[in-house]
């Protein structure tokens, strides 16, 4: 299964509750923090909610 490296590049200040919850469920909360998650539909949906706050790159397993 492919992996995604998700990095927060913009602040969550000014975002709505849905965006705050999506960042928290991804394990993000600070600018510059990165996490690696499986490439699953659930994770892709959370990324779509905060796409303007994060960068996503595919990494090899």
Curated annotation (Swiss-Prot):
GO terms for cellular component: cytosolic large ribosomal subunit. Gene3D superfamilies: Ribosomal protein L30, ferredoxin-like fold domain (3.30.1390.20). The keyword DNA damage does not apply. GO terms for biological process: translation. Keywords: Ribonucleoprotein, Ribosomal protein. One of its GO terms (molecular function) is structural constituent of ribosome. InterPro entries: Ribo_uL30_ferredoxin-like_sf, Ribosomal_uL30_bac-type, Ribosomal_uL30_ferredoxin-like. It comes from the Bacteria. PANTHER family: LARGE RIBOSOMAL SUBUNIT PROTEIN UL30M, MITOCHONDRIAL RIBOSOMAL PROTEIN L30. NCBIfam families: rpmD_bact. Part of the 50S ribosomal subunit. Belongs to the universal ribosomal protein uL30 family. This is Large ribosomal subunit protein uL30. It comes from Thermobifida fusca (strain YX). The gene is rpmD.
